[in-house]
């Protein structure tokens, strides 16, 4: 496998630096060359830039105020260096750099939309209220009827109340509710259109793990309309869902809208039986639940679905790294906390051109050779986490990565920033340590050691302050203080020290995933999230985040939440 990935990495470098793209005149040369000319061809060398310049001029003329002009670049035109394409790692998709900015990429937007607009609400508490307080009978037939009512109401349609305005179905066609349960007997009675079938979506072993964790409980996987969460925020998801749940119970079970039991149903839907994707942030970051800063690394690992369709533990982790770098670096830190150009190329370093993949699969072979197959799927084959093991694997990984950059200067040109290289080197080391030990905090130790080795070798990591969290991170891997020493799976973008800067959080998420994909676990932290997103009806395919980003870049991805129906045709 490592040899195949190495060949693909070299092919990606050739596509990027030895073949002409647009009119950048990159034909010829070798990917190991140490020198090359900057031809200073300007932005017109790139097809997308030409399109953007044309659009910018037309818009400026139409609105009468200056707009996009790449000549406003510190007195020198954009495009002094060659503008080169990216290959999406793990795929053959080649795309324009600009098309990996999330504003230009509908798939990236939809990935976050699909997370933000989702919540999980338990059914059992509501059913107990109906049975014990109201004397209602709850059967598979009544549950199916309730779900039919709910799928009418959840997009914003009326029940119970007459003469209420409603949302147009064509604007909210991505909104629906399904249920799942660990009770096979109940699942058999649920109308299949409403069921996420654990036995169908997961392997036999994974399904057994998940059902053992969920037990006989039943849950609703709720996806409110994309257009709603875009207009409001992530905190609206549970409120929108709870309102429609309450009205649907009233309608389906012939309740009186004003009776006291409605308050219990509402409390269950809004609080007691609610599982949000992300936690509320403190006031200084002022974000409610279901916003990126509150999405833990373990939750993201469970949202990504690669573990359902692949038995390759390294690939499973790399897909989470890609998803995490896009969400945490490009959208969270790059816009929520910063803005504008954002931090796109911190993230692309981890999911393009197979540079991280090449390093990781080298590590897999190294671990399997030295530690008797410890990087293959299994629980009994793991090497015990220790400082010596972490030092060995992380050092080997980092030195290989550094040597690759030095042997292939094109990889250095690709990852032109020190912080990009630091992210990739440390992510490979951390994922490798996690795979070998089945211990995510050992993976964190590998990440931090990689940073120290990198700085020792090359004298610096990234921009000033990039390595703040890395300089103090090792001391907190096993701290007794809960806010410092959390397992990696429970940490997130708002964990102390992690909120400082880019180029880290996606790697931490991949490290969390690697510990569990290496063990063959069906989920990382929460089986409810793993099942909730095991659903082909979602617009974004969470089994292949990187490929979806590529489809968005080449304009093949079809998003939800569009307003074409209610605006003039162009």
UniProtKB/Swiss-Prot annotation:
It is found in: Cytoplasm. One of its GO terms (molecular function) is metal ion binding. Its cofactor is coenzyme F430. InterPro entries: Me_CoM_Rdtase_asu, Me_CoM_Rdtase_asu/bsu_C, Me_CoM_Rdtase_asu_C, Me_CoM_Rdtase_asu_N, Me_CoM_Rdtase_asu_N_sub1, Me_CoM_Rdtase_asu_N_sub2, Me_CoM_Rdtase_Fd-like_fold. Pathway: One-carbon metabolism; methyl-coenzyme M reduction; methane from methyl-coenzyme M: step 1/1. One of its GO terms (biological process) is methanogenesis. One of its GO terms (cellular component) is cytoplasm. Its EC number is 2.8.4.1. Pfam families: MCR_alpha, MCR_alpha_N. Its main location: cytoplasm. The keyword NADP does not apply. Binds 2 coenzyme F430 non-covalently per MCR complex. Coenzyme F430 is a yellow nickel porphinoid. Methyl-coenzyme-M reductase is activated when the enzyme-bound coenzyme F430 is reduced to the Ni(I) oxidation state. Coenzyme B binds at residues 239, 270-271, 284. The keyword Translocase does not apply. The modification S-methylcysteine is found at residue 472. Coenzyme M binds at residues 346, 464. Signal peptide: none annotated. The modification 5-methylarginine is found at residue 285. Coenzyme F430 binds at residue 161. The modification Pros-methylhistidine is found at residue 271. NCBIfam families: met_CoM_red_alp. Belongs to the methyl-coenzyme M reductase alpha subunit family. Component of the methyl-coenzyme M reductase (MCR) I that catalyzes the reductive cleavage of methyl-coenzyme M (CoM-S-CH3 or 2-(methylthio)ethanesulfonate) using coenzyme B (CoB or 7-mercaptoheptanoylthreonine phosphate) as reductant which results in the production of methane and the mixed heterodisulfide of CoB and CoM (CoM-S-S-CoB). This is the final step in methanogenesis. MCR is a hexamer of two alpha, two beta, and two gamma chains, forming a dimer of heterotrimers. This is Methyl-coenzyme M reductase subunit alpha. The gene is mcrA.
């Amino acid at each position: 496998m490592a040899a195949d990935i190495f060949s693909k990495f070299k092919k990606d470098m050739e596509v990027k630096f030895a073949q002409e793209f647009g009119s950048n005149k990159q034909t010829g040369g070798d990917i190991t060359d140490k020198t090359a000319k900057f031809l200073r061809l300007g932005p017109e060398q790139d097809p997308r830039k030409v399109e953007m310049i044309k659009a910018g001029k037309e818009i400026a003329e139409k609105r009468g105020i200056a707009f996009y002009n790449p000549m406003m670049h510190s007195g020198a035109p954009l495009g002094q260096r060659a503008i080169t394409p990216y290959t999406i790692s793990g795929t053959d998709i080649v795309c324009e750099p600009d098309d990996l900015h999330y504003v230009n990429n509908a798939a990236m937007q939809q990935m976050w939309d699909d997370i933000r607009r989702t919540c999980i609400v338990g059914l059992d508490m509501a059913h107990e209220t109906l049975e014990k307080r109201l004397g209602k009978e709850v059967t598979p037939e009544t549950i199916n009827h309730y779900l039919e009512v709910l799928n009418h109401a959840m997009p914003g349609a009326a029940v119970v109340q007459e003469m209420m305005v409603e949302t147009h179905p064509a604007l909210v066609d991505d909104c629906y509710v399904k249920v799942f349960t660990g009770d096979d007997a109940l699942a058999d009675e649920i109308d299949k259109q409403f069921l996420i079938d654990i036995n169908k979506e997961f392997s036999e072993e994974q399904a057994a793990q998940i059902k053992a964790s969920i037990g006989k409980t039943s849950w609703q996987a709720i996806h409110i309309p994309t257009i709603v969460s875009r207009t409001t925020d992530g905190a609206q998801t549970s409120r929108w869902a709870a309102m429609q749940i309450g009205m649907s119970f009233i309608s389906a079970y012939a309740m009186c809208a004003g009776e006291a039991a409605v308050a219990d149903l509402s409390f269950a839907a809004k609080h007691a039986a609610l599982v949000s994707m992300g936690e509320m942030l403190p006031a200084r970051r002022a974000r409610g639940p279901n916003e990126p800063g509150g999405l833990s690394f373990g939750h993201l690992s469970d949202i990504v679905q690669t573990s359902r369709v692949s038995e390759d533990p390294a690939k499973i982790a790399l897909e989470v790294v890609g998803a995490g770098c896009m969400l945490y670096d490009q959208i969270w830190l790059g816009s929520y906390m910063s803005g504008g150009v954002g931090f796109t190329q911190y993230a692309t370093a981890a999911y393009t051109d197979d540079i991280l993949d090449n390093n990781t699969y080298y590590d897999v072979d190294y671990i399997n050779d030295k530690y008797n197959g410890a990087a293959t799927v299994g629980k009994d084959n793991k090497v015990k986490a220790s400082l010596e093991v972490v030092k060995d694997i992380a050092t080997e990984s980092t030195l290989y990565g550094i040597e690759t950059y030095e042997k292939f200067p094109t990889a250095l040109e690709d990852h032109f920033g020190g912080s990009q290289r630091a992210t990739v080197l440390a992510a490979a080391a951390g994922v490798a340590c996690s795979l070998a030990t089945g211990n995510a905090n050992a993976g964190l130790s590998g990440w931090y050691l990689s940073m120290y080795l990198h700085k020792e070798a090359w004298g610096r990591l990234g921009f000033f302050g990039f390595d703040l969290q890395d300089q103090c991170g090792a001391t907190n891997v096993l701290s007794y203080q809960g806010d410092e020493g959390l397992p990696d799976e429970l940490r997130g973008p708002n964990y102390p020290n992690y909120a400082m800067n880019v180029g880290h959080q996606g790697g931490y998420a991949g490290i969390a995933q690697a510990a569990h994909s290496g063990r063959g676990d069906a989920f990382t932290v929460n089986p409810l999230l793993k099942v909730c997103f095991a659903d082909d009806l979602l617009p974004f395919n969470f089994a292949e985040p990187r490929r979806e980003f590529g489809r968005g870049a080449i304009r093949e991805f079809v998003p939800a939440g569009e307003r074409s129906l209610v605006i003039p045709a162009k």
